[in-house]
Amino acid sequence: LSAGMAWSPTNDFNLTVDLYNINITDRILLGATFDGSSDPVIAKILADSGLTQIAGVQFPTNALDTKTNGLDVAANYRLHPGAGLLDFTLAFNFTKNEVTRIDPLPAILVGKGSSYTSALDIVTINAIEKNRPDRRSSLTSNYSQGRFHVMGRISDYGKFVDGSLDGLETFGAKQLFDGEIGYRWDAI
């Protein structure tokens, strides 16, 4: 489900807004890493299968459903100072990803005393829900005249969480500043 609008009241200004809601049933991705070095039940299953040189297994699974909600907004405004062009672009994105269903533990592990509780581990769930900033925004200005141009941009990225089976680490919001000066050598 999505909805959007575009508005251009003049040749020098435009605004777009997009909303979206995406539900995926039986999403396919890599499931939990079933590690035999830390779980004796997994080690026994691997050994019983003749896989004595393998410490763990991971495989694609469709063991979850996900929901993504988001908003994209972009605005562009152009000025005409003298012989040049001055563009301002403001962009904003908010995206929230959520795991809405996880399959239970594979049948081969049920009731065997394994430390695993579902087909997914915290790393996989985190990668979907929190491993990328939930918001991003930028303000860019670009001046050009003839073959010459100058660009400046400030970007803001919201917090995100990275992790492994050893734990999760939260990184706070960050801002980046960048710029560019250019000259076109070929004909305009």
Language-model segments: which ranges?
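Extracytoplasmic loops and strand-loop junctions of Gram-negative outer membrane beta-barrel proteins
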Residues: 1, 44, 52-61, 101, ...
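Transmembrane beta-barrel architecture of outer-membrane proteins
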Residues: 1, 11, 19-25, 35-37, ...
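Membrane-spanning beta-strand positions in outer-membrane beta-barrel proteins
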Residues: 2, 8, 12-18, 85-87, ...
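Outer membrane beta-barrel strand-and-loop segments of large Gram-negative receptors
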Residues: 19-87, 101
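Outer-membrane beta-barrel translocator domains and adjoining extracellular loop/strand segments
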Residues: 27-34, 99-107, 161-168
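Conserved C-terminal beta-signal and adjacent last beta-strands/turns
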Residues: 71, 77-80, 84-91, 126-188
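Short, solvent-exposed micro-motifs at the edges of structured domains
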Residues: 75, 107-108, 115-117, 121, ...
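Long, well-ordered mid-to-C-terminal structural blocks that present hydrophobic/aromatic surfaces
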Residues: 90-95, 105-107, 111
